[in-house]
């Protein structure tokens, strides 16, 4: 862990000094890893012979929200184990740390927003690839003080997001632009770390609003805040909850990655079909949530937005590239296919195995 911690320190210094000044205020600022990672992490990338034979995986998830329930279910219901995998789940909030851990070999697969994977790739980490997407839209709500009712009233206000470059940050900026507001000039955006911190900031009067995914939005609603808009209802196709790895890892351990995809797909089915078991697991991870909040979180994530097969989509990646064009000129010429490997989901789907689960 010493090497990883040392790298994170270097990464923080890099982003704080030159790189943040380059794209100040823009949502992809956390991923100025570029060529640094390609050279610095080469010594960590090689898997030992023992690792290559092992089915042990370290997999991260980026938030405590219903969006991560599929992964929790795969672990807690023994689905990973049933598919021959020994999985450690690690909570790592924020794209930079999980991406650094992936490229250093500390993690083999990461759960993250698609924007983190695409940004890392454009900045030089060309080996990263998106292999599955469980939510291909923005399942977030903008929650505000109750007296804010018109987009024009948002000008000059302060909003909380989990981090600059996070999905909550992207959602806020997307909404503001749709209302002809400039996210860098017309409002103040504060990275708060997590949804509980955003809610605390709103309660303390430090924030006028914040972006939440369920159940955070429901907790805010219960405290008297207003759902200004449900971003999911806008039908924006966007690779939001994704799983990524490296092409090298797929090449060296394709069968293992295939077992992960199969486990994920079984967990999706179990999430949809076993409500009592799913709620019990969600309660374990989403602490202090009452039953009504859990029920609504389940409805949104298991029944409303979750597909049967976790296909990454080119349109979902295209939306990310479009949003990056102003800060990363390379995004304009990039093709979505360069960031995605659909082959593992396709192989499982074409075998008829997914359809048979739902019969």
Positions of PLM-derived features:
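Short, glycine-/small- and polar/acidic-enriched structural segments
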Residues: 50-194, 198-204, 208-214, 227-237
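Sec/Tat signal peptide C-region and signal peptidase I cleavage site
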Residues: 44-48
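Pocket-lining segment of extracytoplasmic ligand-binding domains
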Residues: 196-287
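N-terminal export leaders
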Residues: 19-20, 36
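Bacterial N-terminal signal peptides
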Residues: 28-43
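Secondary-structure end/capping motifs
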Residues: 251-332
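Conserved C-terminal helix/tail region of periplasmic/extracytoplasmic solute-binding proteins
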Residues: 321-359
């Amino acid at each position: 862990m010493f090497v990883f911690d040392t790298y994170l320190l270097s990464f923080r210094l890099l982003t704080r000094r030159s790189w943040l000044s380059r794209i100040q205020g823009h949502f992809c600022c956390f991923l100025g890893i570029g060529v640094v990672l390609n050279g610095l992490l080469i010594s960590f990338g090689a898997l030992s012979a023992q690792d290559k034979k092992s089915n042990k995986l370290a997999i991260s998830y980026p938030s405590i929200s219903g969006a991560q329930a599929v992964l929790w279910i795969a672990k807690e219901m023994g689905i990973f184990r049933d598919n021959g995998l020994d999985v450690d789940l690690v909570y790592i909030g924020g794209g930079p740390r999980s991406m650094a851990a992936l490229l250093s070999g500390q993690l083999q697969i990461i759960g993250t927003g698609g924007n983190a994977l695409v940004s890392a790739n454009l900045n030089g980490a060309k080996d990263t690839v998106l292999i599955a997407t469980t939510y291909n839209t923005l399942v977030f709500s903008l929650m505000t003080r109750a007296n804010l009712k018109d987009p024009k009233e948002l000008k000059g206000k302060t909003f909380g997001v989990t981090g600059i470059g996070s999905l909550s940050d992207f959602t806020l900026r997307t909404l503001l632009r749709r209302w002809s507001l400039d996210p860098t000039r017309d409002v103040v955006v504060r990275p708060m770390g997590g949804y509980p911190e955003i809610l605390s900031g709103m309660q303390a009067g430090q924030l006028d609003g914040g972006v939440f995914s369920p159940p955070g939005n429901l907790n805010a609603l219960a405290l008297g805040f207003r759902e200004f808009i449900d971003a999911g209802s806008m039908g924006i196709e966007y690779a939001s909850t994704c799983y990524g790895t490296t092409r090298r890892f797929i090449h060296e351990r394709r069968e293992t990655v295939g077992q992960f995809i199969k486990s994920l797909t079984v967990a999706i089915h179990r999430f949809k079909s076993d409500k009592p078991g799913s709620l019990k697991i969600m309660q374990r991870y989403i602490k202090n949530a009452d039953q009504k909040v859990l029920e609504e979180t389940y409805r949104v994530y298991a029944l409303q937005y979750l597909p049967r097969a976790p296909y990454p989509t080119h349109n979902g990646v295209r939306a990310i590239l479009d949003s990056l064009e102003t800060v990363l000129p390379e995004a304009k010429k990039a093709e979505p296919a360069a960031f995605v490997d659909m082959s593992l989901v396709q192989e499982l789907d074409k075998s008829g195995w997914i359809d048979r689960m739902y019969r």
